[in-house]
Swiss-Prot record:
One of its GO terms (biological process) is RNA splicing. The keyword Heme does not apply. Keywords: Chloroplast, mRNA processing, Plastid, RNA-binding, tRNA processing. It is found in: Plastid, Chloroplast. GO terms for molecular function: RNA binding. The keyword Transit peptide does not apply. InterPro entries: Domain_X, Maturase_MatK, Maturase_MatK_N. Usually encoded in the trnK tRNA gene intron. Probably assists in splicing its own and other chloroplast group II introns. This is Maturase K. Belongs to the intron maturase 2 family. MatK subfamily. GO terms for cellular component: chloroplast. The gene is matK. HAMAP family: MatK (MF_01390).
Amino acid sequence: MEKFQGYLEFDGARQQSFLYPLFFRDYIYVLAYDHGLNRLNRNRPIFLENADYDKKYSSLIVKRLILRMYEQNRLIIPTKDLNKNLGHTNNFYYQMISVLFAVIVEIPFSLRLGSSIEGKNVKKSYNLQSLHSIFPFLEDKLSHFNYVLDVLIPYPIHLEILVQTLRYRVKDASSLHFFRFCLYEYCNWKNFDSKKKSILNPRFLLFLYNSHVCEYESIFFFLRKQSSHLRSTSYDVFFERILFYGKIQHFFKVFVNNFSALLGLLKDPFLHYVRYHGKYILATKDTPLLMNKWKYYFVNLWQCYFSVWFQSQKVNINQLSKDNLEFLGYLSSLRLNPLVVRSQMLENSFLIDNVRIKLDSNIPISSIIGSLAKDKFCNVLGHPISKATWTDSSDSDILNRFVRICRNISHYYSGSSNKKNLYRIKYILRLCCVKTLARKHKSTVRAFLKRLGSGLLEEFLTGEDQVLSLIFPRSDYASKRLYRVRVWYLDILYLNDLVNHE
């Protein structure tokens, strides 16, 4: 990221002027759509990445936009001239400006974050970026906890709240005015024609969302750090902000509590916070009364401090021993696993019954079948049907599509405690593939399988299945045990497409 700081060329007078590179540095536009920057940030899937831009953006079009921007006395290019000269839709200009503004603002923030991490000697581990790396942590920690708060992060309805949140991070007033202008133009365009696509880039909206969440987490972790005796360097990666302590004092006045009383609620060394997919969970070993206090705390934090209407129904208190926790496409719950140990002292032997608490992570089979039914792989009851829209493709293309989907699901749900539901999903996809091919060749499923043989179904074996089938025979007891082993992979950076499918 330090390499791209030179493109901005900030000096002492323009250190916070984000509009300067936007209007006077031409090559920052080309930098935003440079494929090399994407390759350098493979571990950040949303950073400078959008498949549609590769087809309609080029250096020549970018240069023409810059020249027209310099020639115009007003910021808005007339729709008629824009379509006539560029041949693009009238929201093209706003998409260009929004993504460039996000790129310019993100670079200084990323540099500050990187310097903060380097100053604390925090080790960088790419394995921790995997979604599956969270589950071993939860298996080790949640077994000692009683309750979990499952909270849906609220998002402000009025865009002015986002501007106010960003105001404490950006000192440049002109950049904030331009930022507010883009947001209100976005609202006007959206209200004018709801069928039009968003004129703002998803990266720009994602930057706003991350700033909003980071502001909330900085307050929460600040109070958590001040109240805890266990010092941690992970809390030091958040950015310092202007008037932070003044805002904290105002925050306490709203709650009508003194500092010690609020910290008394937060003093809990057995407290773990995990944020994921627009939600966060707070696991702790508390009583129901304290969990209700936590619920009251979060509701008032969002309503009084961030001016966001936050209903208490969005905060669910789950008891791990009774309720299931929906987490990253898994249903997690605590299960009592009885363990009998035979002990012998001298001539007397006796049995000791021990109960071990184990965290089970299962596949939500009903929601997965609902997603498959929506994509026309099966009906609502889970009975496979043919994929009619794929019959125009070649046999190899159809087979490769089904194999890729099946392997991705097996890869993502390899950590399931019960593989029965996983085998059911794979069965649906296999039979759907056979029915699709049989429909294409105008044959029955039985006749098609008889002609093709069992080689078709072997294509659905995953890599780990192929290795196990070579080492152990399927009838071997050791092989059966290995097939029940839970495996967490460290290369999963995305949620599966069937998770939270809407």
